[in-house]
């Protein structure tokens, strides 16, 4: 069931694109003009989802095992891993169900299939919203730890973090239920796009401000020790490179998906837009790739978490 316009499920029929025989090809739109269509084999999609699933399960298990990691920061990281786990798991589940239905291996009533479809859609949408929210929450947590270092533990207490986490999950589930129910309204898609842009701006502003403070601190140390300025410039370049990678990965992995939703609203029948719609599964694959990259950026850089992860793996 490929995407043909605005009157499709937000996360259900949209990602139920058929598998082509080649990985890259030219497909014709309804006017006969060639469209560049990149096909993601179901095997590759499921494999990436499995890697993400295993990786994020390990993060959750490591944080749950080590009491030293039961701080507000690691609670947000754990919830990010859990939401990423649900993103990959729900997409894998829907792909598997579609393949079984197409193969005739799963025979059930249409009403049951539709109910399952809606449930998976809500799970996928809510986990995506949670993933974006927890990326923003981690940025806020790090910002407070830098700019309010002396008051950090009194501001970011564990009960406050737990209340914030509960609020994020409840709001995401309720919002996704409304989004899936009213998926054919343009306002729903625009709300999702605005939410993504808000998270992008929030992360960019906070991380840029943190980088500026870090460069200022490094400059003060250099002046104190009377070192040469190239060291400060090198630190600034490394910090800028790290920031570019962090925000760049976020934008490249999530941006195409929300661009797709924007085009569904503003040009559902345009020839160029219809060509872009054919690559929806590519955009979902990029999100799955982001769920694989997130633990590398936010979790595995912690020496304590890596040590606990080794203990978890050895215990198995």
From Swiss-Prot:
Instruction: Name its species.
Output: Leontocebus fuscicollis
What family does the Swiss-Prot or TrEMBL record give for this protein?
A: Belongs to the G-protein coupled receptor 1 family.
Q: Where in the cell is it found?
A: Cell membrane
The yes or no answer to whether the keyword Glycoprotein is present is: yes
Transmembrane as UniProt keyword: yes
The record's GO CC annotations read: plasma membrane
Single GO term (MF): melanocyte-stimulating hormone receptor activity
Keywords in alphabetical order: Cell membrane, G-protein coupled receptor, Glycoprotein, Lipoprotein, Membrane, Palmitate, Receptor, Transducer, Transmembrane, Transmembrane helix
Q: Name one GO biological process term.
A: adenylate cyclase-activating G protein-coupled receptor signaling pathway
Location (main, coarse): membrane
InterPro entries this protein is in?
Answer: GPCR_Rhodpsn (IPR000276), GPCR_Rhodpsn_7TM (IPR017452), Melcrt_ACTH_rcpt (IPR001671), MSH_rcpt (IPR000761)
- Where are the membrane-spanning stretches? 38-63, 73-93, 119-140, 164-183, 192-211, 241-266, 280-300
Q: Which residues are glycosylated?
A: 29
Role description: Receptor for MSH (alpha, beta and gamma) and ACTH. The activity of this receptor is mediated by G proteins which activate adenylate cyclase. Mediates melanogenesis, the production of eumelanin (black/brown) and phaeomelanin (red/yellow), via regulation of cAMP signaling in melanocytes.
* Assembly description: Interacts with MGRN1, but does not undergo MGRN1-mediated ubiquitination; this interaction competes with GNAS-binding and thus inhibits agonist-induced cAMP production. Interacts with OPN3; the interaction results in a decrease in MC1R-mediated cAMP signaling and ultimately a decrease in melanin production in melanocytes.
Lipid-carrying residues in chain (S-palmitoyl cysteine): 314
Please list the residue ranges that the record places on the Cytoplasmic side of the membrane: 64-72, 141-163, 212-240, 301-316
Topology relative to the membrane:
Multi-pass membrane protein
Lineage here is: Eukaryota, Metazoa, Chordata, Craniata, Vertebrata
**The protein's name:** Melanocyte-stimulating hormone receptor
Tell me the residue ranges located in the Extracellular compartment per UniProt.
Answer: 1-37, 94-118, 184-191, 267-279
């Amino acid at each position: 069931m490929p995407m043909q316009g605005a009157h499709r499920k937000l996360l259900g029929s949209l990602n139920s694109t058929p598998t082509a025989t080649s990985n890259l090809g030219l497909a014709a739109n309804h006017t006969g003009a060639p469209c560049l269509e990149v096909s993601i084999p179901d095997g590759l999609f499921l494999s990436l989802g499995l890697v993400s699933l295993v990786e994020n399960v390990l993060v959750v298990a490591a944080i749950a095992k080590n009491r030293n990691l039961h701080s507000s920061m690691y609670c947000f990281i754990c919830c990010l891993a859990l939401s990423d786990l649900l993103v990959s798991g729900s997409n894998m589940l829907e792909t598997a169900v579609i393949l079984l239905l197409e193969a005739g291996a799963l025979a059930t009533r249409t009403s049951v299939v539709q109910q399952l479809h809606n449930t998976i859609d809500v799970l996928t949408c809510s986990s995506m919203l949670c993933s974006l929210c927890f990326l923003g929450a981690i940025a806020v947590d790090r910002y407070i730890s830098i700019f309010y270092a002396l008051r950090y533990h009194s501001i970011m207490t564990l009960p406050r973090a737990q209340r914030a986490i509960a609020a994020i999950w409840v709001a995401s589930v309720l919002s996704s239920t409304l989004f899936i129910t009213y998926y054919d309204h343009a306002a729903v898609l625009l709300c999702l796009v605005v939410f993504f842009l808000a998270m992008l701006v929030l992360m960019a502003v906070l991380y840029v401000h943190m980088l500026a403070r870090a460069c200022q601190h490094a400059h003060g140390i250099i002046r104190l020790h009377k070192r040469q300025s190239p060291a400060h410039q090198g630190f600034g370049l490394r910090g800028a490179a790290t920031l570019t990678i962090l925000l760049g990965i976020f934008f490249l992995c999530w941006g195409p998906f929300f661009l797709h939703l924007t085009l569904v609203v503003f040009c559902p029948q345009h020839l160029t837009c219809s060509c872009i719609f054919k690559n929806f599964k590519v955009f979902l694959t990029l999100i799955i790739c982001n769920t694989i990259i997130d633990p590398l950026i936010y979790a595995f850089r912690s020496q304590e978490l890596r040590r606990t992860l080794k203990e978890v793996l050895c215990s198995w």
